[in-house]
């Protein structure tokens, strides 16, 4: 089905018009054995209020159970997805963002993107790895460890080799303990399925002997709507030799 840009835009405007409807019944009135219910209405798109994404305020912290303590280690991270603690105590933070490789071809896709964008938190991720290092005074240093990645997710260290699972491949880099930035250009260990990429994250786990890597590859669809051919090596855990 081909849709003109005018038709898609008009559908989006009409649908988003429903997002401006505000609830006139308080939450308290909607609770209990005899709640107040609004009259039934038909909408092109149900009314909704998309909450705005906000960060922690100054000195604001999550609440933890009694006996536990929580401290801020780092801020300003761009879509952090995975953590890996290195043998020397450094912590790697994988910052990623979806590859956005699927073309918008239906009103549903366009509307979904516009609604999600109302949260204000849809900015691009760092596509990098940040290194956090604890110091003697209890603070943490923050360094850009590796950048220029392609929607990274999984990361593993085997000996002095760092493996990073991008959305389309596994890269390996020479690592020296204690360094705060990878200088090695890296090389590709294995390619991974990455089209169209509905489920793009690639989790990574090393075998105990370090000879194998296991990478989780998500399916390319929810109900094989793109056909079985594009599901080859997807919805699977792939085994990769490190040698």
Say what each PLM segment does.
Residues 1-7:
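Bacterial N-terminal signal peptides that target proteins for export
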Residues 15-18:
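C-terminal motif of bacterial Sec signal peptides marking the signal peptidase cleavage site
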């Amino acid at each position: 089905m081909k849709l003109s840009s005018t038709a898609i835009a008009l559908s989006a405007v009409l649908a988003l018009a429903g997002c401006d409807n505000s609830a006139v019944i308080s939450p308290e009135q909607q609770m209990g054995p005899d709640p107040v219910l609004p009259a039934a209405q038909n909408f092109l798109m149900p009314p909704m209020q998309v909450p705005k994404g906000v960060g922690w305020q100054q000195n604001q912290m999550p609440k933890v159970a009694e006996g536990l303590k929580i401290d801020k280690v780092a801020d300003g991270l761009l879509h952090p997805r995975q953590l890996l603690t290195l043998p020397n105590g450094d912590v790697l933070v994988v910052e990623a963002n979806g590859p956005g490789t699927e073309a918008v071809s239906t009103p549903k896709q366009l509307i979904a993107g516009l609604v999600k964008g109302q949260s204000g938190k849809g900015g691009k991720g760092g596509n990098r790895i940040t290194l956090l290092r604890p110091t003697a005074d209890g603070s943490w240093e923050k360094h850009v460890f590796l950048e220029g990645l392609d929607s990274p997710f999984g990361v593993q260290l085997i000996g002095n080799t760092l493996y990073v699972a991008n959305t389309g491949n596994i890269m390996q880099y020479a690592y020296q303990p204690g360094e705060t930035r990878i200088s090695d250009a890296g090389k590709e260990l294995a390619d991974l399925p990455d089209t169209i990429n509905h489920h793009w994250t690639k989790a990574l786990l090393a075998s105990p002997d370090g000879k194998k890597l296991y990478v989780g590859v998500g399916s390319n669809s929810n109900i094989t709507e793109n056909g079985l051919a594009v599901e080859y090596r997807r919805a699977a855990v792939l085994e990769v030799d490190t040698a």
